[in-house]
């Protein structure tokens, strides 16, 4: 396995000096959004079915990170394969043994998105575009912070999640003490005492952040939760994931939504 990881890192280090890829296969929806924002749409030939491509985009949607198939991947003839940070090492090794160049995205952390952006910018020779996007993700933090708990697919975003920088830009922080994503637990939520709660529903559409009457009603019926100030004062909001909340450049628009939320928060 050591030779595989050394080969992977060597490629990532040298990729900026190589010819840019002409056929990219992406197993990461967040990376796909970043490629689009970098201006590399025409180079994308294969993605997952969850990737935020326009309906008319010619790329095949055959990349499946949960059940990958090498023969199907090779049919797309990629010269670069982008794998998510949670990719099975054995799958990455199979790709390398088949002669495919790969990039493995960063392990999740507060700076993982900007590091991925820099890496993908170098790989596609779109360094200037990557620098411009990073400048938007690196905007100074707003005054605050107030605490906002993000709940998504039964998990709560902690201070080590990739969402932390965009929360800071809007003057928020996670009320949790540690972790990337923590399983939703009502007692832990009560202990965290968030100033507001944002529920993200996994849907392909991008929607604004708005007050959620259904989530408000749900939380008001839970004995250990209904006494929270954020519940009593109706500071319960919801949005859809779309492409804006994925770990990629789409977070620039998520940051704008959070900034608007901070203006109306009671």
For each predicted feature, which ranges?
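Hydrophobic h-region of N-terminal signal peptides that target proteins for export
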Residues: 7-17
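Basic- and aromatic-lined ligand-binding clefts that recognize polyanionic substrates
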Residues: 22-38, 126-172, 239, 244
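A short, structured surface patch at a secondary-structure boundary
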Residues: 22-86
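Structured C-terminal subdomain patch of bacterial secreted/periplasmic proteins
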Residues: 22-23, 110-125, 131, 205-266
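Short secondary-structure boundary segments
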Residues: 28, 85-86, 179, 196, ...
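Alpha-helical, coiled-coil/dimerization segments enriched in small aliphatic residues
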Residues: 49-53, 59, 159-182
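Short helices/loops that flank or line small-molecule/ion binding pockets
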Residues: 70-78, 98, 185-193
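Flexible loop/hinge segments that line or gate small-molecule binding clefts
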Residues: 91-92, 96-119
């Amino acid at each position: 396995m050591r030779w595989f990881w050394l080969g992977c890192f060597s490629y990532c280090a040298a990729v900026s000096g190589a010819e840019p890829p002409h056929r990219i296969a992406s197993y990461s929806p967040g990376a796909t959004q970043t490629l689009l924002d970098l201006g590399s749409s025409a180079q994308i030939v294969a993605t997952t079915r969850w990737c935020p491509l326009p309906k008319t985009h010619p790329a095949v949607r055959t990349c499946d990170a949960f059940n990958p198939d090498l023969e199907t991947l090779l049919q797309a003839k990629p010269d670069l394969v982008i794998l998510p940070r949670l990719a099975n090492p054995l799958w990455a090794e199979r790709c390398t043994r088949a002669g495919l160049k790969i990039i493995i995205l960063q392990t999740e952390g507060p700076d993982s998105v900007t590091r991925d952006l820099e890496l993908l910018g170098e790989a596609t020779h779109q360094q200037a575009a990557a620098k411009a996007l990073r400048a938007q993700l690196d905007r100074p933090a707003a005054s605050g912070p107030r605490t906002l708990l993000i709940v998504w697919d039964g998990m709560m975003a902690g201070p080590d999640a990739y969402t932390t920088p965009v929360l800071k830009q809007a003057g928020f922080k996670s009320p949790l003490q540690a972790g990337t994503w923590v399983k939703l637990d009502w007692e832990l939520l009560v202990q965290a005492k968030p100033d507001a709660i944002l529920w993200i529903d996994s849907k392909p559409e991008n929607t604004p952040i708005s007050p959620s009457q259904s989530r408000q009603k749900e939380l008001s019926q839970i004995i250990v939760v209904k006494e929270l100030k954020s519940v009593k004062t109706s500071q319960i909001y919801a949005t859809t994931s779309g492409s804006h909340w994925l770990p990629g450049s789409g977070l620039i628009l998520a940051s704008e939504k959070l900034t608007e939320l901070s203006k109306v928060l009671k």
